[in-house]
């Protein structure tokens, strides 16, 4: 592309952005939301005489006219009446998106070049971008207010609106299901409470274990949110007189809890500032515009972003809409192999490598906190990565092979590079909030990487990074309250304390005794690790991802040294194996991606194919790493 071509392209991008902001619904959109909106637009050229909308018909799209002229008419008892003409830059169809029907007919008076936003994509974007929904509501309220004032003869007051953030409420479960969940969550431990404890477990430990069993049933059936069940665990222990409040709630004062708090604040800043979107768009431009090239770009995006954003669901929430916009721009039909390949490249890329980086997942900090003190001091950010990278490479190779040969495209793509360039243009130069977020990331990563030299606990870089974000104004008081998942932190803190309680009452020794025959039957630590990985995969068939990971970590990590394994290898196996799925409904991240793309990107059969293949790749990665871990002294202790 020549300099003049670049100039013309930039002028075109500026014109399109200006055209979007002429629509009342979109005037208050920030640049990040506007960039996401551009990805959903479809460029169309229409010859003169074409009927674009018919009065009374279904409203299928909003049109942004870049060049050309259209005539707007309505039917009257006297015949068709011309209301006027629209000459580009202009728009029409915005009310039809809300009403579902056309209020006038529109004919192309000349050849026109326009951008089309389908009603289906508009509704989808509203779900993905709450700020757009609030902008629509604000615009309608202002129109009603202005008309009421005009009718009453009062002066019209101009208002500046600020888009607010809100999340749609989760779908409610049937009442009978919730009642059954409550009954089993409370009833099963109550029925077993009076029984004698198993061999080698004291009565206090048995009762502590029954409360955890009730929590596991609650997490499976979900009569209430998972963090409510977690909070009920220390409450039940305290009411039963099993542990003191200080012991039950000790997890909220651990370094891992504050590391998680800092990491979640950093995740919120990356999402709000647009830094995550900018990184993904830049990588999509670097790789070839072929289907395989874009899949590699999405995988690479995950490898780059995962250590920077330790929240898998947030990464998927950001990348899933981008994969759909990419599929639309490349012209792939719904639920085709080509579309599924893009979705799963983004999904696998932004989740499969979470256990490889210490900062890849908040739950990694949980495992770190469960390690014996000497082992915890050994595993900094670099040591964790060095120990896990061979498994990560095998998982990456498995992902590439699965996507390349299992989800190859049925048709050749059309170019979609121009859409990415338009989105990057609207994002503009890197903003101050992005710069502050990058500085906070730098503080965190420098503290983690150089921790062995600085001799500073891993907690403090995360806390300092969060302070920088708040002091600089990138996260304000409202953002701190609304953008951090406090429910997850409640669950996280309770389960951090659960490990100490289980050690206090001897449950860890009882589990070690239970696993000892399995270790002897395995005959080698290598085989034992693979067996544990398979058992975790089986456990995930029953329990949801987050509770399963945390609960299995609490149960298995502390007993690793007692059965000839380092606690870290057991923790890594739990993190990696629990991160897989066989049936798509097992995976929180897959269900989130399907919801955000309205099920248009893939089928459950394709999800099963990818899930099964990645489960095999993960198990192979664990098995292949065992000689490496033995060489590092992590096996055969």
Which residues fall in each region the model found?
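C-terminal ends of transmembrane helices
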Residues: 214-221, 268-282, 286, 469-482, ...
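Transmembrane alpha-helix interface/packing and boundary motifs in multi-pass membrane proteins
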Residues: 216-225, 302-311, 347-358, 447-453, ...
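Cyclic nucleotide-binding regulatory module and flanking cytosolic helices
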Residues: 2-48
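Juxtamembrane and boundary regions of transmembrane helices in multi-pass small-molecule transporters
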Residues: 138-165, 181, 315, 334-428, ...
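Hydrophobic transmembrane alpha-helices of multi-pass small-molecule transporters
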Residues: 152-259, 383-513, 613-637
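Cyclic nucleotide-binding regulatory domains
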Residues: 46, 50-111
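Membrane-embedded alpha-helical segments and adjacent helix-loop junctions characteristic
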Residues: 227-333, 484-563, 636
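A small-molecule sensor/coupling module
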Residues: 15-16, 33-36, 102-103, 120-160
């Amino acid at each position: 592309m020549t300099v003049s071509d670049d100039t013309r392209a930039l002028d075109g991008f500026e014109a399109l952005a200006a055209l979007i902001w002429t629509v009342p619904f979109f005037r208050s959109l920030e640049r990040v939301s506007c960039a996401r909106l551009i990805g959903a637009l479809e460029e169309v050229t229409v010859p003169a005489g074409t009927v674009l909308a018919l009065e009374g018909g279904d409203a299928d799209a909003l049109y942004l006219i870049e060049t050309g002229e259209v005539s707007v008419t309505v039917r009257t008892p006297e015949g068709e009446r011309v209301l006027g003409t629209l000459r580009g830059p202009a728009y029409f169809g915005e009310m039809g998106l809300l009403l579902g029907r056309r209020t006038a007919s529109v004919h192309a008076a000349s050849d026109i070049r326009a951008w089309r936003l389908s009603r289906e994509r508009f509704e989808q974007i509203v779900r993905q971008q709450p700020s757009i929904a609030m902008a629509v509501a604000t615009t309608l309220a202002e129109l009603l207010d202005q008309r009421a004032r005009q009718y009453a003869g009062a002066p019209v007051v101009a208002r500046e609106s600020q888009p607010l953030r809100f999340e749609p409420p989760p779908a409610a479960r049937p009442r009978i299901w919730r009642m059954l969940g409550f009954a089993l969550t409370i009833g099963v431990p109550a029925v077993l409470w009076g029984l004698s404890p198993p061999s080698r477990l004291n009565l206090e430990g048995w009762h502590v274990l029954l409360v955890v069993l009730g929590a596991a049933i609650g997490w499976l059936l979900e009569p209430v949110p998972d963090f409510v069940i977690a909070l009920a665990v220390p409450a039940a222990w305290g009411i039963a007189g099993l542990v003191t409040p200080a012991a039950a709630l000790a997890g909220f004062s651990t370094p891992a809890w504050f590391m998680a708090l800092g990491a979640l604040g950093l995740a919120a800043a990356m999402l709000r500032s647009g830094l995550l979107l900018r990184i993904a768009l830049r990588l999509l431009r670097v790789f070839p515009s072929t289907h395989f090239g874009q899949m590699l770009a999405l995988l690479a995006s995950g490898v780059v972003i995962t250590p920077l954003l330790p929240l898998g669901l947030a990464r998927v929430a950001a990348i899933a809409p981008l994969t759909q916009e990419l599929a639309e721009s490349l012209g792939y039909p719904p639920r085709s192999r080509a579309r599924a390949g893009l979705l799963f490249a983004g999904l696998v890329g932004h989740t499969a490598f979470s256990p490889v980086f210490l900062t890849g997942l908040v739950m990694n900090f949980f495992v770190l906190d469960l390690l014996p003190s000497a082992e915890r001091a050994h595993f900094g950010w670099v040591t964790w990565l060095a120990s896990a990278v061979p498994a990560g490479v095998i998982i990456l190779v498995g992902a590439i092979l699965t996507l390349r040969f299992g989800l190859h495209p049925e048709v050749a793509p059309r170019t979609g590079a121009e859409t990415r360039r338009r989105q990057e243009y609207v994002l503009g130069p890197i903003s101050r909030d992005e710069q502050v977020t990058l500085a906070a990331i730098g503080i965190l990563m420098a503290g983690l990487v150089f921790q062995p030299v600085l001799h500073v606990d891993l907690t403090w870089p995360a806390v300092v990074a969060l302070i920088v974000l708040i002091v600089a104004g990138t996260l304000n008081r409202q953002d701190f309250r609304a953008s951090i998942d406090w429910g997850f932190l409640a669950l996280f803190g309770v389960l951090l304390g659960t490990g100490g309680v289980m050690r206090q009452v001897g449950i860890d020794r009882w589990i070690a005794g239970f696993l000892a025959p399995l270790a002897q039957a395995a005959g080698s630590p290598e085989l034992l690790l693979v067996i544990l990985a398979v058992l975790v995969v089986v456990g995930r068939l029953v329990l949801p991802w987050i509770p399963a990971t945390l609960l299995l970590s609490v149960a298995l990590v502390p007993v690793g040294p007692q059965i000839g394994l380092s606690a870290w290898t057991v923790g890594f196996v739990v993190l990696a194996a629990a991160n897989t799925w066989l049936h798509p409904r097992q995976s929180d991240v897959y269900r989130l991606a399907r919801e955000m793309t309205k099920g248009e990107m893939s089928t459950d059969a394709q999800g099963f194919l990818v899930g099964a293949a990645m489960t095999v790749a993960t198990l192979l990665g664990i098995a292949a790493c065992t000689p490496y871990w033995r060489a590092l002294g992590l096996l055969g202790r």
